[in-house]
């Protein structure tokens, strides 16, 4: 009979489900403090989606409180708040944040208030305690899928005391579509957002800048990168890298309109902005092809500009990138064939500086004479080209076919690198700053400039330097002589003062007759006294 009972017990134990042996510290329930929050840690695994549902029924009344589900995005950060009872014991206790497993019954400390941080979480986790508020905050940054799992935030010298369990999940970034805006007429709209793919609604990093004037805007898609778009009521942007712009009704009529150009991404190959068309040539359409090649610090950029009657394109090819990016800008003209602007390709690197500085030196007042317009700079010996029809007046009258070489109005512009067009071997550096109003372009080698009508100004400026030098030397010699004269006068005054002091000291040593005793003074003044006379003192009779 006893043998049969033993066999039944063994058979029953073989059909029982295997259970994990609990932690030895949890076997003695009576020895645990009253604030201990018991949980079945053996059943908590990092792979379980809700790690806090399988808990023990033992819960302390002052257990920690906080969020049970924390979610973040890859590369982002999460903030976890753990509230505890603000008692005097809890304020000074150790606060920690740990992760369960592996093995599943061990909670490995990530960060605690004892200045401990796990080596895998350094520079991305921080724990801040607020004892007066009964709160400590854990912040985890640079999230990755490896951070998914179950975590505990608790109080106590060990990680099995008073704690709160939570589940951390990493979710994918939200998908979005490209918005469509409808600003009012003449409104400038600039947005910075990702660009959308024509197939899916996933965004890729990039920046699209929209600039235009009209009543309706419709942007569909673009490629990753940086681009500028000009659109209006009749224009629609198609998927790709080509932007179409159609002017509105009468809103682009006044003034000169700047045609947008693609913004290059490389800082070394920064191209200058398009130069606006002069007022005299607003109704004229140029048809030519200009190609300029220059080499920057890090990349070689070839700019080719094609201007035709019906459309204009700007093509930018970058040689330092593994792929070829082509940005095109096409402007459709209206029925009257109105030229919105002149798109001129950048010719040389020095043109960038000239465009920034030359407008300060181009305008010349009508009150200036002809000599101030056609002069050259003696120190630099360089000529700067200008446009008489746009900004320069000769004797107060605008001209059409005459190119005037004029001196930069400020030394700051010439030293910063104006366009210096010199004859002879300076040919490659010559660049026109603006298009001529009427007439063909004139090469810098031909003598088509209006030179100074007063050549004697140059000789007078040359003789001015020696005269100023001699004048400076003369003034220096006069100052030296004056200083010597003052020094001699000061020396003579000091010598006279020393002599006077010595005489005063001598008179103090030899007393005057008034300072002698009364008897001696009487003897000196008494001339009637005989020569043999002598003063005798009466003798006293000695006493008995």
UniProtKB/Swiss-Prot annotation:
The chain crosses the membrane at residues 463-483. Glycans are attached at residue 167. Residues 484-544 are cytoplasmic. GO terms for cellular component: plasma membrane. Residues 61-169 form the Ig-like V-type domain. It is found in: Cell membrane. Residues 307-325 have a biased composition (Basic and acidic residues). GO terms for biological process: adaptive immune response. Residues 17-462 are extracellular. Keywords: Adaptive immunity, Cell membrane, Disulfide bond, Glycoprotein, Immunity, Immunoglobulin domain, Membrane, Receptor, Signal, Transmembrane, Transmembrane helix. InterPro entries: CD300_family_receptors, Ig-like_dom, Ig-like_dom_sf, Ig-like_fold, Ig_sub, Ig_V-set. Interacts with IGHM; this interaction facilitates the endocytosis of IgM-coated microbes or IgM-antigen immune complexes. This is High affinity immunoglobulin alpha and immunoglobulin mu Fc receptor. The gene is FCAMR.
């Amino acid at each position: 009979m006893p043998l049969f009972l033993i066999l039944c017990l063994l058979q029953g134990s073989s059909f029982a489900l295997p259970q994990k042996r609990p932690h030895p510290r949890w076997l003695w329930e009576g020895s645990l403090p009253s604030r201990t929050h018991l949980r079945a840690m053996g059943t908590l695994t990092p792979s379980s989606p809700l790690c806090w549902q399988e808990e023990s029924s033992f819960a302390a009344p002052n257990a920690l409180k906080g969020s049970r589900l924390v979610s973040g995005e890859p590369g982002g950060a999460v903030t976890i708040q753990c509230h505890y009872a603000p008692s005097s014991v809890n304020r000074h206790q150790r606060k920690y944040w740990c992760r369960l497993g592996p093995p599943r019954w061990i909670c490995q400390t990530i960060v605690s208030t004892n200045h401990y941080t796990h080596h895998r979480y350094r520079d991305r986790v921080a724990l801040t305690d607020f004892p007066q508020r009964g709160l400590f905050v854990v912040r985890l940054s640079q999230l990755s899928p490896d951070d998914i799992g179950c975590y505990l935030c608790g109080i106590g010298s060990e990680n099995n005391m008073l704690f709160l369990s939570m589940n951390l999940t990493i979710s994918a970034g939200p998908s979005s579509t490209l918005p469509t805006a409808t600003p009012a007429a003449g409104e400038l709209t600039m947005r910075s957002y990702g660009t959308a793919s024509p197939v899916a609604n996933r965004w890729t990093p990039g920046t699209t800048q929209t600039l235009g004037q009209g009543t309706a805007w419709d942007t569909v898609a673009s490629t990753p990168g940086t681009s500028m778009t000009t659109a209006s009521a009749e224009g629609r942007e198609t998927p790709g890298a080509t932007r179409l712009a159609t002017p509105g009704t009468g809103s682009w009529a006044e003034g000169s309109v700047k045609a947008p150009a693609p913004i290059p991404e490389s800082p070394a190959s920064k191209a200058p902005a398009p130069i606006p068309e002069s007022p005299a040539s607003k109704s004229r359409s140029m048809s030519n092809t200009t190609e300029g090649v220059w080499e920057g610090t890090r990349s070689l950029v070839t700019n080719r500009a094609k201007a035709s009657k019906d459309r204009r394109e700007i093509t930018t090819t970058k040689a330092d990138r593994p792929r070829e990016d082509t940005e095109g800008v096409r402007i459709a003209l209206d029925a009257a064939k109105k030229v919105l602007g002149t798109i001129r390709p950048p010719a040389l690197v020095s043109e960038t500086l000239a465009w920034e500085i030359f407008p300060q030196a181009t305008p010349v007042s009508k009150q200036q004479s002809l000599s101030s317009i056609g002069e050259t700079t003696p120190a630099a010996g360089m000529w700067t080209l200008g446009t008489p029809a746009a900004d320069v007046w000769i004797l107060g009258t605008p001209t059409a076919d005459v190119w005037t070489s004029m001196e930069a109005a400020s030394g700051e512009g010439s030293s910063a690198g104006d366009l210096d067009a010199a004859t002879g071997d300076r040919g490659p550096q010559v660049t026109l700053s603006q298009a001529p109003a009427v007439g063909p372009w004139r090469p810098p080698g031909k003598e088509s400039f209006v030179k100074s009508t007063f050549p004697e100004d140059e000789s007078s400026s040359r003789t001015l330097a020696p005269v100023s030098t001699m004048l400076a030397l003369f003034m220096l010699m006069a100052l030296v002589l004056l200083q010597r004269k003052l020094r001699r006068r000061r020396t003579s005054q000091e010598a006279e003062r020393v002599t006077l002091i010595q005489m005063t000291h001598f008179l103090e040593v030899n007393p005057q007759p008034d300072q002698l005793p009364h008897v001696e003074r009487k003897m000196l003044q008494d001339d009637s006294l005989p020569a043999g006379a002598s003063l005798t003192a009466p003798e006293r009779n000695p006493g008995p």
